[in-house]
Amino acid sequence: IAGSIRSLLQLSYSEYEIVVINDGSKDATIDVLRKEFDLFPFPEACNTQLPTAEIRAIYHSSLHTNLRVIDKENGGKADSLNAGINLSVYPLFCCIDADSILQPDSLRRAVQPFLDDHRTVASGGTVRIANGCRVDNGMLTKIGLPSNLLALFQIVEYLRAFLFGRLGWSPMNAMLIISGAFGIFRKEAVVTVGGYRSDTIGEDMELVVRLHRHLRLGEKPYRITFVP
């Protein structure tokens, strides 16, 4: 996870925050983060607009002023994402997985639809498999292919899903899913529909479908788009 955070700290974006959520892990996650980023507990008011499991502590980094860490009781991925939304301060938020590594221009490119069209409520980017690639200090330095046949099939499937399926659905405003590994949402819209739900397996797809339903029933103009 430290490598993923380092990749986020190197994003070429003018103003952003990083909120890491430790979902009641029983390993040394918090200890590793404390050591790597010199974290210290910081009492901070946190919105409760979305219900979540109990927040144990909120940490700030003395090395990076835009990095905060939430330590909470276990509640699952959806619950953790809601906790991050509650603490976030900007009108847009980006959700990624703990093992996601973003290219320096990823955030800037994925935010562009919001700048081009004020109706945009969500934007998804392309996710690719890093098996066979080289990652140094949170940065992708060499692109390669894995030797495992199943991993190769997975790469082909990801290319099909993102560069064929989503490219076709996006112009029709019919995107049914934005990958939980990399997606940007308008916070107001997500909070209005109740955030992520913990009682479903595919919380990323369920949220997108719920946004479609809410905005269509309300006859509100909106866009949910994909950036290749």
Outline where the language-model segments fall.
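Short, acidic, metal-binding catalytic loop of nucleotide-sugar glycosyltransferases
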Residues: I5-E15, K35-P43
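Acidic donor-binding loop at a coil-to-helix junction in glycosyltransferase catalytic cores
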Residues: I201-L207
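Short, well-formed alpha-helical segments that are part of the catalytic scaffolds
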Residues: I1-Q10, D31, D79
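Conserved short acidic donor-positioning loop in nucleotide-sugar-dependent glycosyltransferases
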Residues: L8, D23-G24, G75
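Long helical/loop segments within the catalytic core of UDP-sugar-dependent glycosyltransferases
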Residues: F42-N82, N86, Y90, P104-I201, ...
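A conserved acidic beta->alpha catalytic loop
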Residues: N22-F42
